[in-house]
Regions:
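Membrane-embedded helix-loop-helix hairpins and adjacent transmembrane boundary segments
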Residues: 1-509, 519, 527-534, 541-549
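Membrane-embedded, hydrophobic transmembrane alpha-helices
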Residues: 512-513
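A short, polar/charged loop-to-alpha-helix boundary motif
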Residues: 522
């Protein structure tokens, strides 16, 4: 136990040292503490966006879904999250441009600027806070489960240990400490997950043989709709729909748009995103699929611990402990960003500290960490079920307000408020089973109704004093690209290939390889798009020579 614990504590101390390094600079002002001086460049932006988005769910939830559902869950995450990066172009680049000119710090600063209503800004912030705080608890839950399974630390002690260290380095170094720890944590998550994948499959007889054995016992893990029959086409489509509109509304991702150094940095993140999601999610789902053969009788709640269970069986004490730190890195890199962003929402939008502001803001971080831990004391049944029913749906409701505010001059504050209230009412109705949507995810009818309310109220009302001057005109040359990305979305919902006997190629169904290739193609189209767009912005005609003086 002590050998394992010493490895984990060493890693935690390293994260703390990074916070100490950036302590002095982070304590200067709000822009430095919350946004790292608006200077997060290409490499750091990509890794911090990836690490922030790839939470405990990436390791524990994805491997658990692979155990319960099978490979049917891989494309909705690998391709679906990669396609979601298109929203970084749709929303992120415009927010980045406006924030440089208009001094945004929080996501809701845009709402106040565009719609001219402080009360709407507070409503928008409140929704972000309410639906993100449970997600902080998810990271604490996962850390407690992981340390309990691997080291034997009591669940609550493990959750408290990780939460405390995250709170410490965030309060010390602000966003600068977060983006640098994200660089380390994302690298660890990728490398250590790959190492775990290799070790587990080698000890299981090799990649192809292991899959053949799993297929002989659990063929439904290689099919669609999956082992439990849950991945119906409507559910599949719903997940792709959900990621696209919900993920950019996570306040910690939204605030990365504001902190980015320039548009090139954000473009690089977009191009690389499908590659990392295609690769990393394949590893974690595959580990879960193999785990079904190794531990066939786990309950849904127990299945979220399949990753550390396999490491315990197939790796030695030192190696398994080292590799599990990759999963700790995944959850810590999300928790730190959520704590910092929620603190900015509370202190900038509600509390308004005037003296010793950064010191008091650090106190809010401590309070939020404590609250997240308290929620984790009674964890929900499964990570997947919890976040799909609360956080994602609740945040997706905000998308029409943001997109409409960016691109439609008729949108107004009353439409935004009405759509948010109506949408969140539907979220509660679905969560408490007042309403149901058989065969599809609730987010589809919720977001459709929210958008209808937003459009209708915008057309029927006017709101004087709104800042329509920042609304971006739609460029005529964008429509061919709308068709291109719509086509890729259709290819990502390959309904014509469902319910067929899987053809195994190198141990995997052919349709899994199809989605690996589609992720690469998506990245290539992102690259072509940003290059063509950059070329189109270049001034035409010969440049005028400048005479030397």
């Amino acid at each position: 136990m002590w050998q394992r614990l010493s490895i984990i504590l060493t890693y935690l101390v390293i994260t703390l040292v990074i916070g100490i390094v950036f302590r002095k600079k982070a304590s200067t002002n709000k822009v430095e503490f919350f946004l790292a001086g608006r200077g997060v460049g290409r490499l750091l932006l990509f890794f911090t966006m990836a690490a922030t988005n790839f939470s405990a769910f990436t390791i524990f939830g994805m491997s658990g879904a692979g155990y319960r559902i099978g490979y049917a869950f891989y494309p909705v995450m690998g391709f679906g999250t990669g396609f979601m990066a298109l929203s970084f172009l749709l929303i992120g680049r415009r927010i980045l441009s406006l924030s440089k000119d208009r001094g945004y710090i929080t996501p809701s600063d845009f709402i106040a600027d565009r719609y001219g209503a402080s009360w709407l800004k507070k409503l928008f912030s409140l929704v972000m806070i309410v639906f993100t705080l449970p997600y902080i608890a998810i990271q604490a839950i996962a850390s407690g489960k992981s340390l309990n399974a691997l080291v034997g630390i009591p669940y609550l002690s493990g959750a408290l240990l990780i939460t405390a260290f995250v709170v410490l380095y965030v309060t010390l170094g602000g966003l600068r400490s977060i983006v640098w720890t994200d660089l380390i944590q994302a690298s660890m998550m990728i490398v250590f997950t790959l190492a775990a994948f290799i070790i587990i499959f080698r000890r299981s007889g090799g990649f192809v043989r292991a899959h053949e054995e799993v297929y002989s016992s659990f063929p439904a893990l290689f099919s669609r709709p999956g082992q439990d029959g849950s991945m119906l086409f409507g559910i599949w489509f719903g997940y792709l729909f959900l990621w696209f509109f919900a993920d950019p509304m996570f306040p910690q991702l939204f605030q990365r748009f504001i902190a980015a150094k320039d548009e090139k940095s954000l473009n690089t993140t977009v191009v690389l995103y499908p590659l990392i999601t295609t690769f990393l999610f394949f590893l974690t789902v595959s580990i879960g699929v193999l785990g079904r053969h190794t531990f066939p009788n786990l309950s849904p709640a127990e299945s979220d611990a399949i990753f550390p269970l396999l490491l315990q069986r197939y790796a030695g004490v030192f190696v398994s402990t080292l590799l599990i730190t990759g999963s700790l890195a995944a959850l810590m890199s999300t928790m730190d960003s959520q704590l910092l962003t929620l603190t900015s929402l509370i202190t900038v939008d509600f509390v308004h500290f005037k003296k010793r502001e950064v010191l008091k803001e650090k106190g809010v971080i401590v309070a939020l960490g404590a609250l997240g831990f308290l929620i984790a004391v009674k964890p929900p049944q499964t990570i997947l079920d919890f976040i799909s029913k609360t956080t994602f749906n609740g945040l997706a409701v905000l998308a029409p307000t943001v997109i409409g505010g960016l691109y439609w001059k008729r949108s107004n504050r009353y439409a935004a408020a009405a759509s948010i209230v109506a949408g969140e009412g539907l979220v509660l109705a679905f969560y408490f089973n007042v309403l149901s949507a058989p065969g599809i995810l609730p987010v589809v009818p919720i977001l459709a109704a929210t958008a209808v309310v937003f459009i209708v109220v915008s057309l029927l009302s006017t709101a004087p004093g709104e800042n329509t001057g920042i609304v971006a005109p739609v460029q005529p040359g964008i429509w061919p690209w709308v068709l291109v990305f719509s086509g890729l979305f259709i290819l990502g919902n390959d309904f014509w290939a469902w319910n067929r006997e899987p053809l195994l190629v190198i141990g995997l169904p052919l349709w899994v390889w199809y989605y690996v290739g589609l992720g690469v193609v998506l990245s290539l189209f992102y690259r072509v798009f940003v290059l063509r767009e950059a070329k189109g912005r270049e001034p035409k005609g010969p440049r005028k020579a400048v005479k030397p003086t």
